[in-house]
Regions:
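Redox-cofactor binding/interface segments in oxidoreductases and associated redox assembly factors
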Residues: 37-39, 94
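Glycine/Thr-rich phosphate-binding loops of Rossmann-like dinucleotide-binding domains
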Residues: 46-48, 102-103
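NAD(P)-cofactor binding segment of oxidoreductase domains
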Residues: 54-88
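Conserved NAD(P)H cofactor-binding loop of Rossmann-fold oxidoreductase domains
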Residues: 40-46
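Conserved Rossmann-fold cofactor-binding substructure of NAD(P)-dependent oxidoreductases
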Residues: 16-34
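Long, compositionally biased stretches enriched for glycine and/or charged residues
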Residues: 137-325
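Rossmann-like dinucleotide-binding core of oxidoreductases
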Residues: 77-84, 88-171, 202
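Glycine-rich phosphate-binding loop and adjoining beta1-alpha1-beta2 segment
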Residues: 1-22
Length: 325
């Protein structure tokens, strides 16, 4: 309805999809021949954990969101498989923890085109923060930021540890001014500009639509987003009809950026994603999930994600019935 205010009159047609049925999902994709597909599905939302008592929430939160990767990965991976099976090449935008799910899919030949949020929540906040500190208009500020979902949650959620590496280059009116700032403070304080809770999801939605338009309309937009073509973490990217291209400044190589994001992933619950897509949980993540939920898993292969996701949901439901009514 709101699109009418902007002179836009899209046709909207809801269709029920069972993403556990890859064959039927493939048939639907072949029938509809979409230019782009956006995955907004997840089996268990992180925000349910906030409903637990504060001390228990804080304990589970300290396992990091990567602890719930089976729940975050399963449906998006099924959709990616259906897209591949269709033989078509739509832009695939994955919104579900794309810093960690996209690289798993990338290892098994199912890489989404791009993710959303995470670095793309941090980057506009950094620009806003610098504008506030300098009194300069946001339009005069440009940044190049390599960071991870971990940098987004560390200032916001209980139990996350500091020290995740990142890269930040700041320019004002084309002049490099990075040395004028404490970049760790900039990153932390910028994230704190967001209110607590889930209100930030409106910015996540903006990130999603921005990425969609940039590719469908071939805008060649220089922006930030996570998981381009299956890479871990977030990067400066250019989005166009060609898809996603990482665009780094000369001060940092792609290999260095990837290594930074892999190191950050270890502070987000994931020790390693192996070449065959096997996910290895960090030891602290394993211990906390075992202690709080009775969920015991040190590593898993992508094809095991579904069963583990249902096991995680059952463990959470059993725990939640004690506290959530």
């Amino acid at each position: 309805i709101g699109a009418a205010h902007h002179g836009k009159h899209p046709k909207f047609r809801p269709i029920k999809i069972d993403l556990f049925d890859i064959e039927k999902t493939t048939e639907l994709i072949v029938k509809e021949r979409p230019v782009a597909i956006i995955n907004c599905t997840v089996l268990l939302t992180w925000h349910l954990i906030r409903k637990l008592p504060e001390d228990l929430y804080a304990k589970i939160s300290s396992a990091a969101l990567g602890a719930w990767l089976p729940c975050q990965l399963t449906l998006g991976m099924n959709l990616a498989q259906a897209i591949k099976n269709s033989g078509l090449s739509p832009y695939y935008i994955n919104t579900s923890l794309s810093c960690l799910t996209n690289p798993v899919m990338g290892k098994i030949g199912l890489a989404p085109t791009i993710g959303i949020g995470n670095v793309d929540l941090v980057a506009p906040a950094v620009i806003t923060y610098i504008a506030q500190q300098t009194g300069r208009p946001r339009s005069s500020i440009e940044i190049f930021l390599v960071c991870h979902h971990q940098h987004w949650v560390y200032p916001r959620e209980a139990g996350y540890k500091p020290g995740a590496p990142f890269f930040l280059k700041i320019l004002i009116d084309g002049e490099v001014v990075t040395d004028q700032f404490d970049t760790k403070k900039v990153l932390y304080d910028a994230v704190k500009l967001y209110p607590p809770g889930i209100a930030f999801t409106t910015v996540s939605a903006s990130s999603t639509l921005k990425n969609l338009k940039a590719m469908v309309l071939d805008q060649g937009l220089r922006t930030h987003s996570p998981g381009p073509n299956g890479l871990p973490g977030g990067y400066p990217v250019r989005l166009s009809a060609e898809g996603a291209e990482v665009v780094l400044p000369p001060e940092i190589s792609l290999d260095e950026a990837i290594q930074m994001n892999e190191a950050s992933g270890r502070l987000d619950g994931i020790e390693e994603i192996k070449d065959d897509g096997t996910v290895v949980f960090a030891e602290y993540t394993y211990e906390i999930m075992k202690e709080t939920l009775g969920f015991e898993c040190k590593s898993f292969k992508p094809e095991e994600a579904k069963d583990l996701a249902f096991e995680q949901m059952a463990c959470f439901k059993k725990l939640a019935t004690k506290y959530i009514h």
